[in-house]
Amino acid sequence: MSEKTVGSVAEQYGQRGLAERIMSAVRQAFPEGASSDEFGDFDHYHAGGRAATEALAAAADPARGCIVLDVGAGLGGPGRWLATHYDCQVTCLDITPEYCEASEALTQFTGLASLVKVQQGDALHTPFDDQAFDLVWAQNAFMNIEDKKGLFKEMRRVLKPEGKLAFMEVMAGPTQGSPHFPLPWADRPELSFLEQSENYRKKIEGAGLEVLLWEDMGPWLSTVTAKPDSGGLETDIYVDNLSGKRGNWARSRTEGTVVQWRAVCTRP
């Protein structure tokens, strides 16, 4: 991403004092501490919430104790979930400093600091060694990245041979036209880089990855029931205009300008 785009994306998600606000609410809700599972959907800010995390894990089938990179990790909910349920060693990468600060605090609070690390950085230029990860994971993160070819080349670079890339992402739907803004990942069109699923797949395969699973998750998404945010925690603590963004997301899905897709790929 260009420096301008990086700054704009970080600004989209970041808010001054975000970590302090989140942790104040968390400590009030759970004065005696909590496991990551007790947060419900609170730290899974993506379509389908924690149910989507569980569904992606079922498809990816990570080995216990595997080494995971979560790209666009946000507050780190999926990373902590993988650490809790699969004993994975997870690095949560996010472009937004405020999200990284909050993610670290939540990881400490839930007692998972030995398994989950947080790294601030750009998914197109990660600081990791070649072939460092067994699994690269992403949920609703790629929509803010314009250079999909560069993204998938970087994901392949950091994957071990036979490692997997698993993601659930929003793509451009069959209906021509723009979705309605603001959306959960973009307040304005300049921050949203959606592509048709066929183009996605071509770029993935062009980067040297083999597609194992390629699935439209629209029918599944329409059946999902949210897992209540526990202890009174609400996602609007850290997301402005949440109801408006969710409304535009639902409307855009209904009109067919956006779709949700799940994929599992491997590095041969």
Give residue ranges: language-model regions.
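N-terminal auxiliary segments of SAM/dcSAM-dependent transferases
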Residues: M1-V26
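Conserved alpha-helix/loop element of class I SAM-dependent methyltransferases that forms part
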Residues: A29, H46-R64
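Class I SAM-dependent methyltransferase SAM/SAH-binding core
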Residues: I67-H125
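A short acidic, Gly/Pro-enriched loop at the edge of an enzyme's catalytic core
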Residues: L124-L135
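Short, glycine-/aromatic-enriched active-site segment of Class I SAM-dependent methyltransferases
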Residues: V170-L191
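Short alpha-helix
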Residues: S192-G208
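Conserved Class I S-adenosyl-L-methionine
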Residues: L213-P268
